[in-house]
């Protein structure tokens, strides 16, 4: 990658909470399953954090968004693990010889409280993105 070609992407995602808890689809954020008896309505596992990270990377690459690459109209992505989608996006980035330096994520939600899960979520993100934990920031 040309050192003068730094790119910045912005990602955003939102899913509504399901009116009923779906045990087969527990709330998953940043690759961490939360034990809060909540579910999100989504075609995939609904991990809004990983979806936003995918969108940020795709945006930096000029490759559209997650819906373009993994459409919710395609049955093969039904229930897809967002970590798998992220790995495909990271492979696209690597093929272009780009790399991540850091991620800074803001979650806007009143529930669930994320502070008890924050350390595990940062660790999961760092592992998925192959970044040191010090380069992963999560605010809620």
Locate the predicted segments by residue.
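Pyridoxal 5′-phosphate
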Residues: 138-139
